[in-house]
Amino acid sequence: MEPAFGEVNQLGGVFVNGRPLPNAIRLRIVELAQLGIRPCDISRQLRVSHGCVSKILARYNETGSILPGAIGGSKPRVTTPTVVKHIRTYKQRDPGIFAWEIRDRLLADGVCDKYNVPSVSSISRILRNKIGNLAQQAHYDSYKQHQPAPQPALPYNHIYSYPSPITAAAAKVPTPPGVPAIPGSVAMPRTWPSSHSVTDILGIRSITDQVSDSSPYHSPKVEEWSSLGRNNFPAAAPHAVNGLEKGALEQETKYSQAPNGLPAVGSFVSASSMAPYPTPAQVSPYMTYSAAPSGYVAGHGWQHAGSTPLSPHNCDIPASLAFKGMQAAREGSHSVTASAL
């Protein structure tokens, strides 16, 4: 019986798209063909398409079967465990062997015949999926056997220190006599990794430490600079004035010439005995000054009562000093006088 659902072809017959023709109709087509009826007449009589009738009759003449589907069924399995074992053996003996060479060896060794030998693509798939991991593991094991033993890592403890120029400088310091020698690993100064402080970033601490290690005298570090005051410095010697050697200054005064019209004074007064400068009097820039030095030196209102025109603060001026400022003022007074005239 024909199914109650489907589509109607051009002859009025009903069929289901994608489904094979029922076996009863197939058998009827073959019987009518054996009676000598033409395929076109069978198609009109059974209301089946001409192409379907021709295909069924052609398959029956070739195979003798009216059943649908692939003729002879699927191909039997060729990748048997025995074949896989032989392929693994070939690959282990020669890791660089090709798939087509394995196929030829399977035929030469009689493992397979020309009907059940696997194809080149099947052998490649077996090598990739089933034997590839084993080959890589064997290669890795052989590589580990030939690989030399790794060197032991350096111990990181309180004895180990980072290489730095300070360690090289400390290694050159000889050991004092009478003191037992210390091994080099213990004698090296310990320098920890640099922190994020300003002194460590700029390298000030390492520089001061290196100077203190190489110098026989005590050198204060950066941390000690803030605690140092003027009281910590030694006082000047009696024969030194303001931190300078008096003998050297007197030697310079022998070869220096005093300015014309100015007396030579050879003594010094400490800065603590000098009075502070009072506020200078306002002087008009258009006033006319005399060319004589005593004219503009004695005219200032801030001159001390017991001082001389050359030393208004009651202190002596060394003869080695050149009165360039007074000479410049003297020349400036001449220019102002000339411009005013």
From Swiss-Prot:
Residues 168-189 are annotated as: Interaction with KDM5B. SUPFAM superfamilies: Homeodomain-like. Keywords: Developmental protein, DNA-binding, Nucleus, Paired box, Transcription, Transcription regulation. GO terms for molecular function: DNA-binding transcription factor activity, RNA polymerase II-specific; RNA polymerase II cis-regulatory region sequence-specific DNA binding. InterPro entries: Homeodomain-like_sf, PAIRED_DNA-bd_dom, Paired_dom, PAX_fam, WH-like_DNA-bd_sf. It is found in: Nucleus. It holds the Pfam family PAX. Its main location: nucleus. Residues 4-130 bind DNA. Residues 7-63 are annotated as: PAI subdomain. GO terms for cellular component: nucleus. It comes from the Eukaryota. Residues 82-130 are annotated as: RED subdomain. PANTHER family: PAIRED BOX PROTEIN PAX-6-RELATED-RELATED, PAIRED BOX PROTEIN PAX-9. Interacts with KDM5B. Transcription factor required for normal development of thymus, parathyroid glands, ultimobranchial bodies, teeth, skeletal elements of skull and larynx as well as distal limbs. This is Paired box protein Pax-9. The lineage of its organism: Eukaryota, Metazoa, Chordata, Craniata, Vertebrata.
